[in-house]
């Protein structure tokens, strides 16, 4: 029988020389070596900005992990150990993080506890080449655990679209409820009272995107002063966006685009070229808002 060994050889360099090499950007965070893509789980907690991101220990794309770095000022970063590794449910694709406590996530936190909850796309694994949503948590912002050993919380079969492109969850809190936007293919919106049990609110089979985000912004007047009006932004991977309202339609929470952003299909949510342009950089992708702790509460309704 033949035995194959895989050995990874790194250049012998001190940390300083990595970051002083030719063409290395100095302002934005960059991984020391290996493959990195989408930012994940961006959250501010206990005086630190936490940044997770897609990572593989190779120059080429491979089985995704969640690597990790922290900062106190968004300029100076400290690399931390990799936190989430592939498991029986699959490799670790993109996701997000929120702050919760016993009242808002009683299955995860005991009375008096709070911490971070992560939502991760598990890709592949024992279930085949499909995508599903799993969770993890931290009660101190320093040690991390997969929830229920990585158990699947939401599956691609749970909504009427039955589309296996089911990834990139982004969670936010609004009206005393948790909401999740999921895409990768078509957009879906789910809701939950406890971050564990999720229900379908609305689906948009004609609108395809990756790395969705949905957040409110206060409208400003012609003098650049804030008004009482709030609009919601559906961010399509940091490249394009739609502006509209997030509200109940026939008892289901839905994103309803303003007329200038709407398409001609029934729910106004198609892929026609009527989106706003968020940036023109061809390599700028998978943008995500930083979760600042009390986003979605009466104390801090608007995104920062």
What are the language-model segments listed below?
Residues 1-212, 216-280, 293-304:
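Beta-rich carbohydrate-recognition and catalytic domains
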């Amino acid at each position: 029988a033949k035995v194959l060994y895989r050995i990874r050889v790194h250049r012998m360099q001190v940390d300083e020389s990595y970051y002083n090499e030719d063409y290395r950007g100095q302002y934005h965070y960059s991984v020391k070596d290996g493959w990195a893509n989408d930012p994940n789980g961006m959250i501010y907690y206990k005086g630190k900005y936490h940044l997770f991101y897609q990572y593989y220990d190779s120059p080429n794309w491979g089985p995704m992990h969640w690597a990790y770095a922290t900062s106190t000022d968004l300029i100076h970063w400290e690399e931390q150990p990799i936190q989430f590794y592939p498991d029986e449910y699959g490799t670790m694709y993109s996701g997000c993080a929120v702050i919760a406590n016993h009242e808002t996530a009683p299955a995860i936190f005991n009375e008096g506890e709070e911490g971070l909850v992560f939502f991760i796309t598990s890709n592949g694994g024992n279930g085949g080449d499909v995508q599903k949503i799993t969770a993890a948590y931290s009660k101190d912002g320093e040690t991390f655990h997969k929830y229920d050993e990585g158990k699947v919380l939401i599956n691609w079969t749970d909504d009427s679209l039955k589309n296996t492109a089911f990834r990139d969850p982004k969670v936010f809190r609004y009206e005393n409820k948790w909401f999740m936007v999921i895409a990768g293919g078509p957009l879906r919106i789910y809701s939950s009272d406890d971050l564990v049990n999720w229900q379908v609110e609305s689906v948009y089979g004609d609108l395809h995107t990756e790395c969705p985000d949905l957040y409110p912004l206060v409208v400003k007047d012609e003098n650049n002063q804030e008004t009482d009006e709030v609009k919601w932004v559906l961010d399509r991977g940091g490249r394009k966006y739609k502006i509209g309202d997030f509200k109940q339609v026939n008892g289901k929470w839905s994103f309803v685009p303003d007329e200038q952003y709407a398409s001609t299909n029934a729910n106004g949510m198609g892929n026609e070229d009527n989106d706003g342009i968020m940036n023109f950089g061809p390599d700028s992708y998978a943008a995500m808002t930083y979760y600042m702790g009390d986003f979605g509460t009466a104390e801090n309704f608007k995104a920062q």
